[in-house]
Amino acid sequence: MAAQLIVALDLPRKEDALVLARELQGAVPWCKVGMELFTLAGPDIIRELHDLGFHVFLDMKFYDIPHTVAQAVKAAAAAGAELLTLHCQGGERMCSEARIAADSYGSKAPQLFGVTALTSFGPGEMPGISADPSDFALELAGKARSWGLDGVVCSGHEAARIKASCQGLRCLCPGIRPAGADTDDQQRIMTPARAVQAGADFLVVGRPILKAPSPAEAARVIQAEMKAAV
């Protein structure tokens, strides 16, 4: 499957997110609902984005005791989320119970992606962890695969190594910035073309699209770059 673009609807009002989503109809396949938008709008935003024709990635990065995360996965699946994130550092029991919870939805089970090392971390910045973020991401990816997760969230810099060592595991890469774009608060960034060449399956882009004069055109340009990189 060719790499797909996910637009992060990281906006402060539900109405703004829906206006942007309508502008992006037919231009992108996926939208991301993150903590800010979900806290503002609740599960109804997932249904409303489905009604506009989008696949929905719910990026809540679940991290709690196994039972709580399993129940949250069920709630997200019932709301229609098709891809969810949870922290690999929650451990085997948490991730395994999340897998069981997701699978209880049969053909409508959401994909589960484990968060490895946030792309805002640079070397030596992860609290209590001395490993380089890229090495730490690779270690957690191996665990995620053994725990039954569908993929991991990692920077494009880790994608090639993860793909080589964890056969069948998908990579979802935030921190994607077109050449010349502001890095904002991201550190381990990569261009769309390089991320695709590294093996990314999903590319998450927010501000370079949200802040563009024409978000739909910005999304089309990024997808053209992704397609040309194959």
Write out the residue ranges for each language-model feature.
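Generic structural signal for hydrophobic
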Residues: 23-24, 49, 76, 144, ...
